[in-house]
Amino acid sequence: MKETIAFIGVGRMGANMARRLKDKGYTVTAVYDSHAPLATALAAEIGAEACKTLARATELASLIITVVTDDKAMRAIFAEQGDSLLVGAKGKLFVNCATVSPQVHLDVEALAHKSGAESLEACMASSITQAREGTL
């Protein structure tokens, strides 16, 4: 089965990572951003769905890549109540690329595990050019 990918957080880094994977033949099915116009524009460009909820992004992908700004944003997308990436997460893989505190990564890993999902820490170094070129 071919992996389907969702991106959560499609600012400059997330959007360029999504573009790169799409250009390389990967199936990017969903994008989500707290600033909806970013997701809408990128979705139109790469042929993905601009999700209105985090749960919808989880539903549409087997691999969910998160590229959010900080601890608060990471905790919000992995909330235990309400709209969350954890809704329907059983069997999914989260790859968390945000640079957040070690405790947040541990907390997210525990929440994912509790939901039947897996979570990997994949912090990045470099910038937008490297994201677009695939050299992070």
Range-by-range predicted roles:
Residues 5, 99-136:
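Rossmann-fold dinucleotide-binding core
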Residues 51-105:
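Rossmann-like NAD(P)-binding element
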Residues 14-17, 75-77, 104-107, 131:
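Short glycine-/acidic-enriched loop or helix-start segments at secondary-structure transitions
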Residues 42-45, 80, 84, 107, ...:
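Alpha-helical structural signal in soluble globular domains
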Residues 1-67, 92-93, 131:
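NAD(P)+-binding Rossmann beta1-loop-alpha1 motif at the extreme N-terminus of oxidoreductases
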Residues 45-51, 75-79, 117-122:
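Short gly/ser/thr-rich secondary-structure transition/capping motifs
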